[in-house]
Amino acid sequence: MEAPVARLFLLLLLGSWTPAPGSASSEAPPLINEDVKRTVDLSSHLAKVTAEVVLAHLGGSSTSRATSFLLALEPELEARLAHLGVQVKGEDEEDNNLEVRETKIKGKSGRFFIVKLPVALDPGAKISVIVETVYTHVLQPYPTQITQSEKQFVVFEGNHYFYSPYPTKTQTMRVKLASRNVESYTKLGNPTRSEDLLDYGPFRDVPAYSQDTFKVHYENNSPFLTITSMTRVIEVSHWGNIAVEENVDLKHTGAVLKGPFSRYDYQRQPDSGISSIRSFKTILPAAAQDVYYRDEIGNVSTSHLLILDDSVEMEIRPRFPLFGGWKTHYIVGYNLPSYEYLYNLGDQYALKMRFVDHVFDEQVIDSLTVKIILPEGAKNIEIDSPYEISRAPDELHYTYLDTFGRPVIVAYKKNLVEQHIQDIVVHYTFNKVLMLQEPLLVVAAFYILFFTVIIYVRLDFSITKDPAAEARMKVACITEQVLTLVNKRIGLYRHFDETVNRYKQSRDISTLNSGKKSLETEHKALTSEIALLQSRLKTEGSDLCDRVSEMQKLDAQVKELVLKSAVEAERLVAGKLKKDTYIENEKLISGKRQELVTKIDHILDAL
């Protein structure tokens, strides 16, 4: 008797289910979740929910076969969904991913998905499927701020029941936590607790769209590392190389560090900053070479590279540990051989590469921009992606020897996790003749260069010689040297005048004698140089030779007056000459000297 009664109860529950518009009607096959085993993995900063669902076709008055079924997301978590995948239990995962398409349900809010079954379900038949969902940023730190020595606790809120548009006959839920330290958790159905596990259920005869808040507050010191923004640039060359560069903005999205940071305590105490991030590992393709890792300052030498058989493991250690709320930025780049990723048949090319690659375990990428730079001349570009991505208008990129630019595919996606590490395929056409464009440009450039050099060396660009002009230039050069030497000689006189004045004040005869000796030596040298230049002017046939000769004679008179002034000063100091007489004589000497200097200036102006 119990089985018919339970069956009648479930049929009554099905009467309240609203089918999907367009995909189901009042004659939609009656489905039921016969058994659901749900696992909620909260051991990292992600919430991974896996449900093993035994889906049954009740049959009854309906004889139609079920070709698809509906999935619903919990209203509290639907906005943070990063990944949804459905597979048939017990079959090869790679070949058995079911087609999932988002849809709407009339009269119901929230997000719903239609899952296409691999084989139509007959009345009375069953099928076991595995529903995998991954949610990001649903574990909230509580308290939101902690000191360096405190541990991190988080709160998660979900649903005790499997949220579904179908009634569920029996269901259980196992919650896997990051530690055994649990502050509190909801007690619906007297759950059992063992170490870091919470087991709920079984819950029986659960109506469709049932909700009951599940909440747990527990210790979670796993790295709450989030890539807030990432730009991945892939540059393809048909000459055998693919260059990859990733610009990454990182942030610790756990509990914000409260108070100061002590590096001394951090190094001394193993449990200091237990929720901080010292380093993480990035897995690069096995063929990666010429790997570099740098930030705004420059190359970061604390990174380590380990080459394995199937990958290249890179340990990235930022310049400082990351605590809650702290950010950093870095760039990783490497080269790949194109023969492993680029395929062609004639002018048809296909590039098969990952849309996003591994950055760290349990990665979360809030915003990703991928730029694929194709060779110049690539046309008819199409993209095949395993999941939905957003395209921006194509751009152009210019580099060495480019003429009309390389096409750049720009694609965006938000909220990515490890499940998005899948290949995309870029199809395009490329005329192989264009591969000769750059070598021909180089050859043409060298040809033009050599031709220009040949023409240049065969042309005569020399200026016709003018003997008269050359003579004038030589005379001008000699005259310039004469002017310089005359000015130096006049400077000697001024310097000697200062020596005489110092002598009159100090009455030190050695100062005067030293000044006379210096004057005689330097004056003789300058006069000899001027005489040599005078002879060169005479050789050039210039009439300036006579003027220089006249200037030499005037200078001899100036020198004589300068020395006479010194003699008068000696007589004054020795008391052989009265001061009034000395002043009168000095006035006469200065007048004659000034007259001679004026004549010399006129000659210099004439030169």
From Swiss-Prot:
Residue ranges crossing the lipid bilayer per the database entry: 435-455
Membrane topology, Cytoplasmic segments: 456-607
Membrane topology label: Single-pass type I membrane protein
UniProt topological domain (Lumenal) ranges: 24-434
Alphabetic keyword roster: Acetylation, Endoplasmic reticulum, Glycoprotein, Isopeptide bond, Membrane, Signal, Transmembrane, Transmembrane helix, Ubl conjugation
Entry superkingdom: Eukaryota
Keyword Transmembrane helix: yes
Single GO biological process annotation from the record: protein N-linked glycosylation via asparagine
InterPro entries according to UniProt: Ribophorin_I
PTM summary: Ubiquitinated by the ECS(ASB11) complex.
Signal peptide location: 1-23
N6-acetyllysine sites (modified residues): K187, K538
Pathway: Protein modification; protein glycosylation
Compartments where found: Endoplasmic reticulum membrane
GO CC list: oligosaccharyltransferase complex
Sugar-bearing residue positions: N299
Covalent link location (Glycyl lysine isopeptide (Lys-Gly) (interchain with G-Cter in SUMO2)): K538
Similarity annotation: Belongs to the OST1 family.
Subunit structure: Component of the oligosaccharyltransferase (OST) complex. OST exists in two different complex forms which contain common core subunits RPN1, RPN2, OST48, OST4, DAD1 and TMEM258, either STT3A or STT3B as catalytic subunits, and form-specific accessory subunits. STT3A complex assembly occurs through the formation of 3 subcomplexes. Subcomplex 1 contains RPN1 and TMEM258, subcomplex 2 contains the STT3A-specific subunits STT3A, DC2/OSTC, and KCP2 as well as the core subunit OST4, and subcomplex 3 contains RPN2, DAD1, and OST48.
Protein task: Subunit of the oligosaccharyl transferase (OST) complex that catalyzes the initial transfer of a defined glycan (Glc(3)Man(9)GlcNAc(2) in eukaryotes) from the lipid carrier dolichol-pyrophosphate to an asparagine residue within an Asn-X-Ser/Thr consensus motif in nascent polypeptide chains, the first step in protein N-glycosylation. N-glycosylation occurs cotranslationally and the complex associates with the Sec61 complex at the channel-forming translocon complex that mediates protein translocation across the endoplasmic reticulum (ER). All subunits are required for a maximal enzyme activity.
Protein name per UniProt: Dolichyl-diphosphooligosaccharide--protein glycosyltransferase subunit 1
Species name: Macaca fascicularis (Crab-eating macaque)
Taxonomy of the source species: Eukaryota, Metazoa, Chordata, Craniata, Vertebrata
The gene coding this protein: RPN1
